[in-house]
């Protein structure tokens, strides 16, 4: 693809994403499905703007590569050892049982047994990119079903190596066509990467960090990710697996958080590119020609994988509600099928349109997953949000909530317990199923679902409540809820959690003045204790804390309309000088009046 064509493709990708994803979000079908539909629209079977799908699809796998690197950073060898039962137990069982069932069904549809084996293995894999994105959207990454889902995906990535090695064996039906020397070299290169990464990465990043140039650190991070991916690709292995291992090797290093920050902006955009490319790869010609076969195949694929996953989750001990989410989120075919089926086709394992039919089935199964998850959400909402006639009478006469608490993580739990202890009537909205189950046991009135949906807010009693406390993890959800409440429930007194100064500015601009930055108060309190431990009188430390809080809040309001970095830095320096002057005056006053507490305490 030439430079001009590549630039045009980039513009088309961005345009399609900007148009399709907001429309999909407004329709409630999710960003992932929006990306897929955008890909169909601009691909060879849509408007035909882009025809070189294979090259773009290979490039777009970088989105999955960046995602797996960040996941690797969040783990460490000790955590992986803890997950060994779920990785090599549930993960291996899922691939084995799904591959056997699906491969057997393919043999019934006139696939040769060799093609059926490869087809079964490829269809048994799930989409790492889609599943992880949906798990994050649904809050599953905070509960056991999310950890189990990640374990299954990790085993599937590990299964890439033997699956690809199996293709030439099946194609040649003997050892004559199989180069054991080449396989041995690949294994040695892989082991060399592990050993080299273990002993070289930290010193290299220590040397780069010592330069103090942030751009060089970002460049080194990109070099590591892309280099690992290229190395694994040259070995004929999974690029995502290579970057995942690189992430694990750096998971316990002091540079972990800095690496996450450097990579994060690229991850989201490239993931979107991947989903658009998958949509472009959908062969609508094959779909039209074999419509009935494809529809039945998609239904069977999703049903078989859902059944296998649900059964394994039950054996593992997940609750029924978590089983449904776990089975649904991994029910689709995955991106690895594109690689495996292409390799098999190059070895002439497939006949006629067999490969095209399998790829269309995989692509359409990926498009069904967001819809299936919405259906599961509705079923769970019905189960958890309808009144239970067998419940005991509430301990307050008026059943209408005074306060709605959105999100019941560590931040929301403290607020909820304080309100309950003071006999306030609260209703909690939470999308983590395990948290909903737990809270109901302890007598909380909880609604399961996405609080940014207007109907859920109505069901929770927003029209009768006095206040709403928003403690969402994602700032986007917080701002969407603020807008929703201001538009439909203007009487509600809005209180919100801000993760930092940027979110605080956004809340102020939206007219929300009652917010709390999640680490600010606790950091101030610890700072006060530090001053006391260093010999400062408790009275003086308390006043220092008070002045700092007051000045910081004033700065927050003053800097809200300022967008220039230079202007912000200048204002921060002025504020620091002002704070020093206040502390100097306070010290002089304390020398004159050392004891006693004033009206501010």
UniProtKB/Swiss-Prot annotation:
Q: Which PROSITE patterns match?
A: RCK_N
List, in alphabetical order, the Gene Ontology terms for molecular function in this entry. glutathione-regulated potassium exporter activity
Chain ranges of the RCK N-terminal domain: 400-518
Localization, UniProt? Cell inner membrane
UniProt xrefs under Gene3D superfamilies: 1.20.1530.20, NAD(P)-binding Rossmann-like Domain (3.40.50.720)
One cellular component term (GO) for this entry is: plasma membrane
Its main localization is: membrane
Q: Where are the transmembrane segments?
A: 5-25, 29-49, 55-75, 87-107, 115-135, 152-172, 177-197, 207-227, 230-250, 261-281, 284-304, 326-346, 356-376
Cystine connections: none
Which BP terms does GO give this entry?
proton transmembrane transport
Is the Transport keyword given for this protein?
Answer: yes
Q: Does the keyword Membrane apply?
A: yes
Q: Which domain of life is it from?
A: Bacteria
Q: Which UniProt keywords apply?
A: Antiport, Cell inner membrane, Cell membrane, Ion transport, Membrane, Potassium, Potassium transport, Transmembrane, Transmembrane helix, Transport
Protein topology in the membrane: Multi-pass membrane protein
Its annotated function is as follows:
Pore-forming subunit of a potassium efflux system that confers protection against electrophiles. Catalyzes K(+)/H(+) antiport.
Question: What name does the UniProt record give this protein?
Answer: Glutathione-regulated potassium-efflux system protein KefB
Source organism (scientific name): Enterobacter sp. (strain 638)
What taxonomic ancestry is recorded?
A: Bacteria, Pseudomonadati, Pseudomonadota, Gammaproteobacteria, Enterobacterales
